[in-house]
Amino acid sequence: MSMYNMDLDKVIRKINKKGARTVGLQFPEGLKMQAVKIAKAIESQTPATVIISGDPCFGACDVSDYKMKGSVDLIVHYGHTPLPLKYEVPTLFIEAFSNIDVKKDLEKCLEKLEDYSKIALVTTTQHLHLLNEIKDYLEDNGKEVVLGSSKNTKKGQVLGCNFSSIKNLDAEVYLFIGSGNFHPLGIYLF
């Protein structure tokens, strides 16, 4: 369906198991292009009607539960790692892991990292599943790699509202695995 694993089978199973009649979909900007395809798939494979949130979405702390309360039985929130928060509407988080092969890009990256020996590796939810592979590749090429973590993040993960996982890593350089400017800018400013 896309460059990301939208885990549609899991979504369909959850909707059918819950018996949800109306489902709200929420996406961060980079994944909104998938909204209509996903909505059509859900409506064709479940008895549910889908409402797509067009509001900006900046993270797991920005679920549209207050806006959708009373209108939907379930929210499917794409692109973020769940936080230990209480939501007004049952919410299913789909992290939307990237399907991209980063090997060729890592080879190019290695050239730019030539002058650095200790690298802090950071990413967003979409690439967390690749971190061990990337770390191994860099270490196999003579680099020392550090992964930080903090409360409410996984190892190597930064959130748009929480960059503390990169604190005190004592790295010479930060290697961000992801797309866009938002998270790298936050890393730079932190």
Please place each PLM-identified region on the residue numbering.
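An N-terminal assembly and electron-transfer interface module characteristic of large anaerobic redox
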Residues: 1-190
